[in-house]
Amino acid sequence: MEIKLEHVSKKYGRHTAVNDVSITLSSGRIYGLIGPNGSGKSTTLKMMAGLLFPTSGFVKVDEEQVTREMVRQTAYLTELDMFYPHFTVKDMVNFYQSQFPDFHTEQVYKLLNEMQLNPEKKIKKLSKGNRGRLKIVLALARRADVILLDEPFSGLDPMVRDSIVNSLVSYIDFEQQIVVIATHEIDEIETLLDEVIILANGEKVAQREVEDIREQEGMSVLQWFKSKMEVC
């Protein structure tokens, strides 16, 4: 599978959230979409998922223009809590199973066990860290072609972040899936990434292979990001 954003722009009224961005994503690769708050990361992810359509430009999947059907092929983790608070964890699992044919029930219970989440516990009684874990569990339990994670580490303590990174390593299909992680927690994901894309002020600043950054620039991804932001 290949996803292409071709000269994509998105406006909300007079505000331009994304401006003339072109990106190509291929199966079997993990991408870091990084940038400061308000750089257009979330809007870009939503256009990749078919949840938003561009004001101009095209989003294509295998050369076909993206439609709402793309949502069915995409596991999208929003930075917002989208849970029904009166549900238990098990209720939420059953809801996802009813909505997504690619939802893997056996895998979800393995993940719940690894994340130390009690299926019988009410969502409203989960800590912020455990709600973050549950969002990751529900995303990774799908056998989706595309996994889009919007700020998966936001507000979580280092121990929770480590458990999430370990789950990503264990449950992502590194041969078949496209994975995009939008974050400003760059150090947490550097070891996972194949490529990094920098957005700033709604525009693509750079896209580079992580290996090239290390070998040719002699920098970590965070150092490279900071050097690019200095000239923006």
From Swiss-Prot:
It holds the Pfam family ABC_tran. It comes from the Bacteria. ATP binds at G35, P36, N37, G38, S39, G40, K41, S42. Keywords: ATP-binding, Nucleotide-binding, Transport. InterPro entries: AAA+_ATPase, ABC_transporter-like_ATP-bd, P-loop_NTPase. Transmembrane segments: none annotated. CDD domains: ABC_DR_subfamily_A. GO terms for molecular function: ATP binding; ATP hydrolysis activity. Residues 3-226 form the ABC transporter domain. Belongs to the ABC transporter superfamily. This is Uncharacterized ABC transporter ATP-binding protein YhcG. It comes from Bacillus subtilis (strain 168). The lineage of its organism: Bacteria, Bacillati, Bacillota, Bacilli, Bacillales. The gene is yhcG.
